[in-house]
């Protein structure tokens, strides 16, 4: 089977991570290509791709309307001639007039995304039930749900230990520094209110809110407790998540929450906002803790509870490791996509 993935950019994010994981799995038994439309991509992420994957880079400037970019896009699609054209940004299909020659699939990676061209796709997939509900509530056909996947076997497991009074309780948050979406400022405000010098927070990721979050850290006099580590490659993350006592994901908007699943796979207790998608991952509180989203008081309450009852949190994290392996392992997720592709091919051949 020939599978071509199409995405606007390849920087750090859940959609990009899924595309890489999916392509690397699929190339084991298929011919796989990846087309990146814009000139926004991370060489580190490209280096994670299997060498057998054919990469096409159009290098379009963001928001450009250069007709030559459209021509180049269609030339690459025609050249690869996929059985499956798997697109990860909805409106990209509008720029592929030769789309009718291929079976097109859209994966919707977040809530409230503009979905121009949605009805042109042969099949649509959402990365969570929450995203599927959000899509249906906008008057569009409900997409099938296939969760994002993680390589659970590649994630180093934590050594269970309860920090003593002299040790720092280490919190980690992983994601783009976009506080209006990911809510990192809530952690800073909660840390300030807790008034404990034995709690530290590491932010892993980069983004447009970096300067704002650094300034909030300075204003709250948290410089000795807060570290901004910048982007880290997936190998580093998978190796070091286990160094932390708690992963906090205080999202204000979230379509899935890949790093929540990664923390669970590492055996790290997790605390997430009570949005529908994160609650799916922690099985409505059976596999992790949650607080009212955008509520610093409730975040403080739950942080105090987890620190005080950390032995309970570790027991919960043991269950969560099994849960995430059974439900979100990348091999399982990738196979679900292969099954979806094969379903189309079978129907085509039996017409």
Go through each PLM region and give its residues.
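Short His-centered aromatic/hydrophobic patch
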Residues: 65-69, 86-93, 108
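N-terminal strand-loop element at the rim of the active site
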Residues: 5-68, 207-212
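Active-site donor-binding acidic/aromatic loop of nucleotide-activated sugar
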Residues: 209-212, 223-233, 240, 289-290
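Carbohydrate-associated surface elements
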Residues: 130, 149
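Conserved acidic donor-binding segment of nucleotide-sugar-dependent glycosyltransferases
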Residues: 284-285, 289-296, 305-310
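A conserved mid-protein helix/loop that constitutes part of the nucleotide-sugar donor-binding site
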Residues: 16-21, 169, 178-193, 208-214, ...
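Short hydrophobic beta-strand element within catalytic cores of glycosyltransferases
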Residues: 269-272
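Aromatic "clamp/platform" in nucleotide-sugar-dependent glycosyltransferases that forms part
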Residues: 252
């Amino acid at each position: 089977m020939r599978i071509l993935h199409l995405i606007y950019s390849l920087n750090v994010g859940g959609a990009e991570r899924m595309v890489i994981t999916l392509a690397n799995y699929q190339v084991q038994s298929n011919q796989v290509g990846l087309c990146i439309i814009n000139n926004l991509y991370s060489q580190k992420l490209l280096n994670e791709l299997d060498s057998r994957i054919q990469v096409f880079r159009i290098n379009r400037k963001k928001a450009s309307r250069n007709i030559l970019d459209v021509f180049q896009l269609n030339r690459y699609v025609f050249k690869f001639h996929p059985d499956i054209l798997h697109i990860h940004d909805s409106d990209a299909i509008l720029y592929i007039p030769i789309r009718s020659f291929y079976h097109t699939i859209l994966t919707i990676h977040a809530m409230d995304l503009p979905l121009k061209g949605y009805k042109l796709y042969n099949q649509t997939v959402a990365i969570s039930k929450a995203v599927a509900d959000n899509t249906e509530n906008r008057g569009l056909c409900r997409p099938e749900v296939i969760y994002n996947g993680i390589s659970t076997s590649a994630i180093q497991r934590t050594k269970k230990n309860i920090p003593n009074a002299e040790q720092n309780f280490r919190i980690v948050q992983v994601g783009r520094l976009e506080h209006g979406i990911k809510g990192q400022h809530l952690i800073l405000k909660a840390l300030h209110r807790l008034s404990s010098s034995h709690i530290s927070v590491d932010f892993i990721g980069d983004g447009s809110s970096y300067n704002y979050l650094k300034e909030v850290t300075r204003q709250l006099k948290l410089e000795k407790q807060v570290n901004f580590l910048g982007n880290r490659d997936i190998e580093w993350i998978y190796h070091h998540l286990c160094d932390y006592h708690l992963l906090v994901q205080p999202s204000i908007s979230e379509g899935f929450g890949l790093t929540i699943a990664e923390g669970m796979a590492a055996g790290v207790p997790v605390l997430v906002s009570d949005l529908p998608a994160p609650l799916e991952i922690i099985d409505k509180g059976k596999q992790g803790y949650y607080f009212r989203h955008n509520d610093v008081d409730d975040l403080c309450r739950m942080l105090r509870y987890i620190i005080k009852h950390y032995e309970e949190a570790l027991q919960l994290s043991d269950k969560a490791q099994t849960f995430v392996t059974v439900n979100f392992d990348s091999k399982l997720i990738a196979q679900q996509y292969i099954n979806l592709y094969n379903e189309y091919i079978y129907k085509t051949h039996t017409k």
